[in-house]
């Protein structure tokens, strides 16, 4: 039976206005829209009155329900039939944890009520299309129709393909029908294999073969034999990549054989809780570094949010499934798309060349895709710290003559670093009889055929197959699984995981055979033991679907009880679906039909399938010389600063949490004005050291339209110049990931790919001492469609994205682009040696040209000398600022440095040649360094010692003020206000934010950038930052116990525990499941802290599901009430913990006036480094800090204070319960965005109780308790940042 319950309004006023504006633009007479959530409860038994009231209360969240009955025609948008939304999974979990076992499943839709004039059927279809995503949603016209969401179908049996009866044609038909993308020789191989077995193949076996042997999974092109221009080549592409490891194996612990590569890290204190006692402590051991970079291009083209989200999720799983289990740590993300053509902001170089109906626009990708990637990282609890964004789409004269080149099939890059224990780097042995386990969520009928689909050019496969290959994301589930993996590796020698892989392309059909095969075993499986939420799925659908957030593991049979205990505590679902066998055979039994859908020798599936041979021809690009006519420097500057590749990326940065873990030492945002120009990302190796890791990206894809090899060399060079200004040491410490994207089969591209791989793998990297131990390829970067009567193709340039990773000696010595105005000199290190080539530059692109000669690595020895020289200068502390030269050239390098320093530039380019345009806009490798004027001679001497004397040019100095002036020989070449340039540079991000977020907030942020008087972030402290008020109490040896409380989805507990630990507490890991099961109580604790994250993925209001699981369980409710009423206890709630505790007002004395915390005014997750002031309040945690003004990490989507009315707000303030407020950089309390990131009235962001014993706050002091983890800080701070005082105050209060 189904019950329907109304919910809160689903759209804010500005979202409704945007919809109405879109309808008006489409000339649809829609006058008004109202939208509200509707909840559907599938019940297995009727609810009594109390249970019904409880369900209603559970589903009451968000803004208040409209009092009036909605008017207009109903359009009900629900998740696509046959799928279960992430919201449903998490909301159902909450209902069960609150004792509502009669609820089979909760689901949610949006009811749109449309008031309109007379609309034709076609116009209604337009309205419907505007209100839903056909890839993920279904539209109904009556609420009762939602009953179809819960329809259950009978299981369907396996289907046989009549090969023996119909011969080869049966396989050809199945290939088309199932979208298998099998090549002719693979069809021959299968015909031969099954004829020898003497039976017909089942559809599931063919599907499994296609996924396991797709280009996506098998990398056939990279393993192929090559004939180029009739000449047999000596090596495959992969062998040339492996050559880098053979030449420089130094510091690499694992390459090419696992889900990620591993290199040596540093010995540090890894901080985690003991399995038996729950007590957190440091464990001194090597924290080796793992690295991985994936792409998820095809799904992102079809449905950008889930495509990018599952791209990040899959890469995170790769990291976690490395060795015998590892810890993902920090991420990077990248996008290459065609031109944005922002409505009303189209740029002169953007022409509309059309696109296929079935893929979305570049603008859609960049509106939704980054949000999906960021949302997954945010909810999982991994900071996203680095990235790139390129737009390219043009008709150019390239290798194959004049043709369309661009990224209709986008690049969506997802990568990152993690850490792994030394004894877990290598996978274990799988014993015969070992249990084969699926860890994670249930099978669902989604994401079918992703491996094969992403191996085809967009436009080749059937639209329905594209539809089937879209996936859905549930990062909170992945977090639960990762917590289990963490508990396992933390056990050291007792780790129950023998072998682990993630489930990705091809689902279990790919993952399980890979698991057993890699472990040297076969496997026997039972299909019906696989967790499934859809009983009507066929064997093929159960075995081959790509439901996300799953891992496959081998666990020794005697370790299963321990593994079971860990999973239950973390509420991570798992199923034992088989066991390892001696015989290298794969059998899958179906208990329901008592048959064998799979019965194959492993070598048929993974054996010697036909090897590919690529017989290709070389084509050389001629290019046309750049036409300079009509190009002025002033116009070029304005155009280039508006090119999205160059322009400000704030809209891509502030949506992503950049402080979670408390180990982020360098994010994208630089300096007091928080400008996104960092060269690289940096994390500390632990919470107790200054060792660390760095990541940087290099890519220069448009250059490949002129010179394949140069483009590849530049990608490596740019990654190196980006990562150089950190303290790494020997260049051999740097390891690279290479992600290759190409349109295989397109004339000239295959030979070009070979040329590019050879340039990097055989020549440049070995010469530099660089290794590429990991990478990925995507070989179908072409889109085909019909535009009117014309067949069109959009082919991407050959694109190599290099991600560089390194172990750091000291993260504090990372140099940023932020300029200082002390007596200084700016030096350009020009590795282009005066070539100043303009081919395939940003300048060429904004004038719709390609040019002829591009930049290149001109001298490998000088590139190596450059790196070594910068390392020497970093070690000698001679650099004030550093920024590499890249897209946009020297002009952009200097401008970005000036933006970061909020200063002027007085530049002189006289020594850079007579061609001023080329001097300013060439994109040859190099960097600008700022040094003290007094150090200039010593610095030039170091550069000369490294062979760079002829590359160094004095190009002026940074000066106070707002003028950005470039001269040569006393003549002004360019002069403009730095503020004007800053505003131009910001206009793309402003327009994207206006489209995507609340336009009023976007306007306020853009307006703030034009204020030259803005003093930037600043600090005023009312206390001595170096005083340790807890020291006398720590000296007694007593360590009070603090319960570090977490719920499923919480992700900030480790850094919180570390902050309390440093202040003299014993921090104890307490999961809500411990309290609900009675394993742990609160009676032994002196303090309690509820941590940040996404409990239950925030589905029933941020923190509300967590609170209700306490309020609706009598014993646990009493436990919390008793704790809060006990004298001499302290409690802190941060972010999600703040939201949760604000919903426990009925249990917390003196909290009656506390507000609720609701959706930010921007309608967006906000990650900012915000200025707050400590106000006079009873808060015991903030004692002695009143009047202080200091920045703090902010990361939330629902942090806006909501009060009932003005009287409620006045009472809250008059009682003095407000503890922190947002202030602007002038020190004034503010409601203006982004200084106030959520729009809270009067800047309120923390409140306390009347006794001061319980304080809740939205910002994160635990993430910035160490100075090194602050995005910016005054230079005179020591180890501890000012927010450490909160935790020491807590220790002091407890005596």
Curated annotation (Swiss-Prot):
Entries under InterPro entries matching the protein: Class_I_gatase-like, FGAR-AT_N, FGAR-AT_PurM_N-like, PurL_large, PurL_linker, PurM-like_C_dom, PurM-like_C_sf, PurM-like_N_sf
Pfam families hit by this protein: AIRS_C (PF02769), FGAR-AT_linker (PF18072), FGAR-AT_N (PF18076), FGAR-AT_PurM_N-like (PF22689), GATase_5 (PF13507)
Recorded superkingdom: Bacteria
Residue intervals of the Glutamine amidotransferase type-1 domain: 1042-1295
Binding site for ATP: 307-318, 678, 886
GO molecular function: ATP binding; metal ion binding; phosphoribosylformylglycinamidine synthase activity
CDD domains referenced in this protein's UniProt entry, alphabetically: GATase1_FGAR_AT (cd01740), PurL_repeat1 (cd02203)
Binding annotation for Mg(2+): 718, 722, 884
Residues at the catalytic site: 1135, 1260, 1262
Matches recorded under PROSITE patterns: GATASE_TYPE_1
Enzyme class: ligase
Subcellular compartments: Cytoplasm
GO BP terms: 'de novo' IMP biosynthetic process
Reaction(s) catalysed by this chain's protein: N(2)-formyl-N(1)-(5-phospho-beta-D-ribosyl)glycinamide + L-glutamine + ATP + H2O = 2-formamido-N(1)-(5-O-phospho-beta-D-ribosyl)acetamidine + L-glutamate + ADP + phosphate + H(+)
Principal location: cytoplasm
Cysteine disulfide links: none
Pathway assigned in UniProt: Purine metabolism; IMP biosynthesis via de novo pathway; 5-amino-1-(5-phospho-D-ribosyl)imidazole from N(2)-formyl-N(1)-(5-phospho-D-ribosyl)glycinamide: step 1/2
EC number, as in UniProt: 6.3.5.3
Keyword line: ATP-binding, Cytoplasm, Glutamine amidotransferase, Ligase, Magnesium, Metal-binding, Nucleotide-binding, Purine biosynthesis
GO cellular component, one term: cytoplasm
Residue span of region Disordered: 305-327
Family the UniProt entry places it in: In the N-terminal section; belongs to the FGAMS family.
Protein purpose: Phosphoribosylformylglycinamidine synthase involved in the purines biosynthetic pathway. Catalyzes the ATP-dependent conversion of formylglycinamide ribonucleotide (FGAR) and glutamine to yield formylglycinamidine ribonucleotide (FGAM) and glutamate.
Entry-linked NCBIfam families: FGAM_synt (TIGR01735), PRK05297.1 (NF003672)
Assembly: Monomer.
Protein name (Swiss-Prot/TrEMBL): Phosphoribosylformylglycinamidine synthase
Organism encoding this protein: Shigella dysenteriae serotype 1 (strain Sd197)
Taxonomic placement: Bacteria, Pseudomonadati, Pseudomonadota, Gammaproteobacteria, Enterobacterales
